Amino acid sequence: MKLQKPKGTQDILPQESAKWQYVEDFARKTFRKYNYGEIRTPIFEHYEVISRSVGDTTDIVTKEMYDFYDKGDRHITLRPEGTAPVVRSYVENKLFAPEVQKPVKVYYMGSMFRYERPQAGRLREFHQIGAECFGSSNPATDVEMIAMAAQFFKDIGITNVSLELNSLGNPESRAAYRQALIDYLTPLKASLSADSQRRLEENPLRVLDSKEPEDKAAVEGAPSILDYLDEESSAYFAAVRSMLETLQIPYVINTNMVRGLDYYNHTIFEFTTEVAGSQLTICAGGRYDGLVAYFGGPETPGVGFGMGLERLLLVLDKQGVELPIETALDVYVAVLGADANGRALELVQALRAQGFAAERDYLDRKLKAQFKSADNFKAKTLITLGESEVESGRVTVKNNHNREEITVSLDQIQENYQLIFEKLGF
């Protein structure tokens, strides 16, 4: 048997992982500006954490979960999304306690798992960046969450970004709309796809975001949820729209957008961008005021979003955004002869201790091959260390870009390479 990675997974090699790290660090800096701290939850959870919160009838639970029974006969699932584990952690760690500063603002990054057809930008193991805010029912929190995502996209260089917005209202408004939608779709049931016929019984709002052509045709004349918002829900949505306009964040209302998870209420949103003529969703989120109580905590409002890291990297690549990734070595030490081996190791360790990125030859190659390695590593400076240099205690340090050279003592390098680095123009 040929040993290969499982279908729908990927190996992220060093050259590629540098881009991942850049995007992750960029997100961390953005979150820090908004006073968010990082939370890390287990990669696997009890099955009920996901099934009860995400919704027993969602595609995630019915078709896509990686779940199994462990050796203690506990029903376990690999996490398919980030919000439910964070809410579980919020409740379990009593972050709702009065001594904890509110609102509680956290972000996460990590692997998620869904058994679905692998496609560009979405694999069975995929990586998500997300943020969650607990404890504020102020519509300004929703807008801040949207503004944070918008700032991230703008600052990192993603263009043609559009914001789609909708409201699912409070539970009363949602229930009224649910019934209106059932009344509208029931006479059309025979024309719906098999999945949507099932959803009509279990979760009719999901019919609205079906991608099947027959479902799209059926919902064209569907009632708008905005017509079923009560006074409280209408006022909340109006406040969100007003504050977005104040911040000059353009948006489009999409009344057919309902989100694939059952726990949302009031504001929901998606950011999309255009890649090769098609629209790609790069961020999605919304408000979920009932989820903390559902996990056994007190009534606590919440709002959050998630972004797929693979999809972000795909968009950055397709839109031609050059990420300023520093991969160049500061110093490469070419080693000539066995007598220089130990001294070369001592030298690179001293350089690293001073904060320089340093590498040396370990393969006892000819100088020409070592110089080629220095070029491949984009080394800024080059030191050649042979037996004669070890004996004399003096070496030549070369600017590997313009070939300028200076001769210095090994002691000078070990004590303060920064001075030499600057003399060579760096």
From Swiss-Prot:
Entry-linked Pfam families: HGTP_anticodon (PF03129), tRNA-synt_His (PF13393)
Subcellular location as annotated: Cytoplasm
Cysteine pairs bridged by disulfides in the record: none
This protein's GO CC annotations: cytoplasm
Entry superkingdom: Bacteria
An annotated GO BP: histidyl-tRNA aminoacylation
Broad class of enzyme this protein falls into: ligase
PANTHER family tied to this protein: HISTIDINE--TRNA LIGASE, MITOCHONDRIAL-RELATED, HISTIDYL-TRNA SYNTHETASE
Subunit note: Homodimer.
HAMAP family assigned: His_tRNA_synth
Protein family per UniProt: Belongs to the class-II aminoacyl-tRNA synthetase family.
Protein name as annotated: Histidine--tRNA ligase
The organism of origin for this protein: Streptococcus sanguinis (strain SK36)
Gene symbol of the encoding locus: hisS
